[in-house]
Swiss-Prot record:
Keywords: Amino-acid biosynthesis, ATP-binding, Cytoplasm, Kinase, Nucleotide-binding, Proline biosynthesis, Transferase. It is found in: Cytoplasm. This is Glutamate 5-kinase. It comes from Shewanella pealeana (strain ATCC 700345 / ANG-SQ1). It is an enzyme of class 2 (transferase).
Length: 372
């Protein structure tokens, strides 16, 4: 690899189940060897690599001889517990061929929700990278419940990119990238090679495109790309079976769909608000508040709130939505749901009179808010 061609310093590579199994019921070890070789080449060239890998449940099924288990959460957790050890063993053996060590990080939403745990995870990730060790990240499916799951490794990889301050996220799948129509149904579908803005039309386009296996379709990849690019991370969605795909992407060759990063990325704390805490509730806001928040960069005042959804405490993260459910922003509330219910529609100067105390004029301050 020509060092002068490399355009990145730190790269997160996400491998979906469909890439690791090549559409079969077991891990495709031959293809994993090839992927490990490409990542090892990057490491040897001075590019730090973080691997976000799916495939634990598939590996568990294979190792146990495809047992007939009930379709329950406990069965999936069993398979994940067995399969994760096999998955990390396989990657460890493959990277050892190139004299490289790996370190395992299993995360849940809870690790990202709490600011202190988020920073601890970041420190662990950076410690591995600073010592030339390849971090291998997966969701901790053996213990994760619906409440604490990130949900898919596309979004987990985007959060990993934020954690380690990567400048490129590569999402490898069984598709060549994002198309302007479903290529399986429309032979005239064209690959979208460059995306500079993710809007509702693009989200609708990705909504029906699903990868062959795993929990992540094209819609989740678009969500991941949006999170990453807001933090200044470039994103590429490409086929995991394209020859030398990882090296070609890192050398900025025209492969897959490239998402440009925002010119002015979010600062660290707002990155955490965007990617870390799960929203505990929603505030329905009127047109005036939507304009003030999204166009003028102002805080959300109680006057603009028309409805409170969910139960939350002071400091919890909320979504700001319109009456149709469209999300305009995400931020941390200075008041509990009980408080906001009392304050909704009222002027800020009446807060102390209504509640008997005052945490400030804004329900969600602009410094604690990310506009989407």
């Amino acid at each position: 690899m020509n060092l002068s061609e490399i355009g990145y310093r730190r790269v997160v590579v996400k491998l979906g189940t469909s890439v690791l199994t090549s559409g079969s019921l077991k891990l495709d070890k031959a293809h994993m060897v090839e992927l490990a070789r490409q990542m090892a080449c990057l490491m040897k060239a001075g590019v730090e690599v973080v691997l976000c890998t799916s495939g634990a449940i598939a590996a568990g099924k294979e190792h146990l001889g495809y047992p007939k288990l009930p379709d329950t959460i406990a069965s999936k957790q069993l398979l994940a517990a067995v399969g994760q050890s096999q998955l990390i063993l396989a990657w460890s053996q493959l990277f050892s061929i190139y004299g490289l060590h790996v370190g395992q990080l299993l995360l849940t939403r809870a690790d990202l929700h709490d600011r202190e745990r988020y920073l601890n995870a970041r420190d662990s990730l950076n410690a591995l990278l600073n010592n030339g060790i390849i971090p291998i990240i997966n969701e901790n499916d053996a213990v994760a419940t619906a409440e604490i799951k990130v949900g898919d490794n596309d979004n987990l990889s985007a959060r990993a990119a934020l954690l380690c301050d990567a400048d490129l996220l590569i999402l490898l799948t069984d598709q060549k990238g994002l198309f302007d129509a479903d290529p399986r149904k429309n032979p005239d579908a064209k690959l979208i090679t460059e995306v500079q803005n993710i809007d509702d039309s693009l989200r609708m386009l990705a909504g029906g495109a699903v990868s062959g296996l795993g929990t992540g379709g094209m819609a989740t990849k678009l969500e991941a790309a949006d999170i990453a690019r807001r933090a200044g991370v470039e994103v590429v969605i490409a086929s995991g079976h394209y020859k030398d795909v990882i090296q070609n992407v890192v050398c900025k060759k025209p492969v897959g769909t490239h998402f440009t990063a925002l010119e002015h990325p979010l600062e660290s704390r707002k990155q955490w608000i965007l990617a870390g805490p799960k929203a505990r509730g929603q505030l329905v806001i009127d047109a005036g508040a939507i304009g003030a928040v999204t166009e003028k960069g102002r805080s959300l005042l109680s006057k603009g709130i028309t409805e409170v959804k969910g139960l939350f405490q002071r400091g919890d993260t909320l979504e700001l939505i319109d009456t149709k459910g469209k999300v305009y922003a995400k931020g941390m509330s200075r008041y509990s749901s009980a408080d906001v219910t009392k304050l909704a529609g009222k002027h800020s100067d009446s807060i102390e009179e209504v509640l008997g105390y005052d945490y400030g004029d804004a329900v969600v301050h602009r410094n604690d808010m990310v506009v989407l």
